[in-house]
């Protein structure tokens, strides 16, 4: 190997979190992005930073995109910008004080993004573009589906269920295939021929390489330190190999492209490597009678920030509860979990639920996004900067989020409800990642179609207050949070209070009946019997039973397993923790 060789790979974060998990509008094709690249360089207020008002002018006036969609892309890119928790909380407070659309627009006008980075972010939306040829080849014919004409939404949902956001091989292929077009967007307009193609003697300024660092990073041979691409090319040997000229202070486009093709490799911190050689975690139990073993792997012990990954697959009929440093600021993927109860009570970078069924998932605060893909009958409870749901059915999602929930194609019978739980360290975790209780747009979803937001009220509903029940995290932990952050919306709070009043009225009725000791015993037996029958009818007996695994000693003092030590744990309503003793003792941390 050459002493001065380098390895370059696609960064995980822009592909995982930046590319929306649906086909982009046609107006975001490379043809229109080339025009935009030339336009922003010749207009005041567009380069090197692009403000919201100028982007809205380009998106709505030039590209004919709806304003909601223009803001979606701008906001999504801004969510990835590195900001301190204090800055995020200040921004949330400013948004929450806006009382009118005009005030909101004035506040948004204070945002600006790096223009070259934003251009590449828009180009990155091509990652999940639907290929008609691939769809036709992949569709078996004749098939039962061919007897009835499939709607466009069904075909789109099928395509979106195969999104490539976690596929590091797809990331590498995307960059290798489209490297020429990517470099075109970064080149000065004068460096392109009349056909829009870079000439053989085209040049690229070092500032453009900083834009390319959004997508690429790497390391020198025999070195473990990871550098953005422009810093890696700041080293003299690599500058020479990549065609840097000290005279023109620029790179040869042809030589740079050739060097990148030779240096590009698979991301050593991606999902493939994590599955193959990541550290395995013995957090899950193997359930008798199951064909596949639960797998949990991580690379958090060696990956740089933004590339920390924890993969959990095949969790079946068990409860997994963790508050661990191994989860902190990690990108978590839950894959094919079935009839499981999962509590990940740490600050997380991002979370993806893929092909999960009949499960409950409760998350700590998520810095960027939670994505639910191809799931069925999942109950999700989380605080997150963004929620996206695609190709999923009969899922109930309780969320606190400062952005509009993004509903992608293929959803059926979703239910959106307010965030309705807490655990003792929740508010501390929220503050540590910069998530506030306001604004909270949980009930204002944005429906995303192939050509922009398309209203489809049949795909979701807002949870009726009559069906609302608070969720109690059934583990004892140290901390100060003792109620739902921000409280419940008034109509839901009223429903809870009315239900509590009915319970109190019923208890008073029992007390006023003046039952003797034998009658009280018989009545208690009857209540317990009916309660257990209700648990079986509602399918919640398994949730209680799964809280009784054998106690496991944490492998690390900061790796807390929130397992239950009591013989029969109880789930109790808020403010009634002394009541309902029929099921047993309160679970504690082992």
Locations of the language-model features?
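Detector for repetitive beta-architecture
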Residues: 329-331, 339-341, 350, 358-360, ...
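Feature marks extracellular polysaccharide-active and adherence modules
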Residues: 335, 343-345, 354, 362-364, ...
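A general structural signal for short secondary-structure boundary/capping elements
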Residues: 376, 386-389, 406-407
């Amino acid at each position: 190997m050459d002493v001065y060789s380098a390895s370059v790979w696609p960064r995980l974060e822009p592909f995982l979190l930046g590319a929306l998990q649906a086909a982009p509008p046609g107006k975001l094709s490379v043809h229109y992005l080339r025009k935009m690249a030339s336009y922003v360089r010749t207009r005041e207020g567009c380069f090197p930073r692009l403000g919201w008002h100028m982007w809205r002018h380009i998106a709505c006036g030039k590209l004919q995109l709806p304003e909601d969609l223009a803001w979606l892309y701008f906001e999504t890119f801004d969510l990835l910008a590195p900001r301190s928790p204090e800055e995020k909380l200040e921004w949330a407070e400013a948004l929450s004080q806006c009382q009118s659309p005009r005030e909101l627009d004035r506040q948004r006008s204070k945002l600006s993004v790096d223009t070259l980075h934003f251009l590449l972010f828009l180009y990155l939306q091509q990652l999940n573009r639907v290929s008609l040829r691939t769809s036709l080849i992949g569709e078996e014919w004749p098939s039962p589906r061919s007897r009835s004409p499939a709607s466009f939404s069904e075909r789109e949902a099928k395509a979106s269920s195969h999104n490539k956001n976690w596929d590091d091989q797809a990331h590498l292929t995307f960059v290798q295939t489209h490297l020429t077009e990517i470099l075109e967007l970064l080149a000065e307009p004068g460096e392109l021929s009349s056909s829009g193609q870079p000439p053989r003697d085209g040049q690229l300024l070092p500032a453009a390489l900083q834009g390319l660092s959004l997508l690429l990073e790497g390391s020198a041979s025999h070195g473990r330190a990871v550098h953005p691409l422009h810093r890696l090319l700041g080293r003299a040997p690599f500058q020479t190999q990549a065609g840097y000229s000290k005279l023109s202070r620029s790179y040869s486009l042809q030589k740079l492209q050739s060097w990148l093709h030779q240096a590009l490799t698979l991301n050593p911190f991606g999902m493939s490597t994590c599955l193959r050689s990541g550290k395995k975690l013995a957090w899950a139990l193997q359930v008798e009678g199951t064909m596949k073993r639960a797998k949990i792997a991580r690379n958090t012990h060696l990956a740089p920030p933004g590339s920390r990954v924890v993969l959990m697959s095949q969790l079946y009929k068990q409860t997994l509860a963790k508050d661990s440093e191994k989860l902190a600021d990690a990108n978590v993927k839950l894959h094919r979990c079935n009839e499981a109860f999962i509590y990940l009570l740490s600050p997380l970078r991002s979370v993806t639920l893929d092909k999960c069924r009949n499960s409950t998932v409760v998350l700590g605060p998520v810095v960027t996004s939670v994505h639910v893909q191809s799931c069925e009958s999942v109950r999700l409870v989380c605080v997150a900067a963004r929620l996206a749901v695609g190709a999923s059915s009969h899922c109930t999602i309780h969320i606190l989020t400062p952005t509009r929930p993004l509903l992608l194609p293929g959803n059926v019978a979703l239910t959106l409800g307010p965030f309705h739980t807490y655990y003792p360290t929740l508010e501390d975790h929220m503050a540590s990642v910069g998530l506030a209780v306001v604004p909270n747009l949980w009930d204002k979803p944005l429906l995303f179609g192939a050509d922009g937001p398309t209203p489809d009220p049949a795909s979701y509903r807002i949870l009726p207050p009559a069906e609302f029940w608070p969720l109690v995290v059934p583990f004892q932990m140290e901390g100060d949070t003792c109620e739902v952050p921000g409280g419940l919306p008034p109509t839901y709070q009223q429903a809870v209070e009315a239900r509590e009043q009915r319970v109190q009225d019923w208890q008073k009725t029992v007390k006023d009946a003046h039952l003797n000791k034998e009658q009280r015993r018989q009545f208690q037996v009857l209540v317990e019997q009916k309660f257990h029958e209700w648990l079986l009818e509602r399918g919640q007996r398994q949730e209680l039973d799964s809280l009784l695994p054998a106690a496991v000693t944490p492998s690390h003092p900061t790796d807390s397993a929130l397992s239950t030590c009591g013989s029969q744990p109880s789930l109790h309503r808020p403010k009634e923790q002394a009541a309902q003793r029929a099921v047993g003792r309160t679970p504690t941390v082992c």
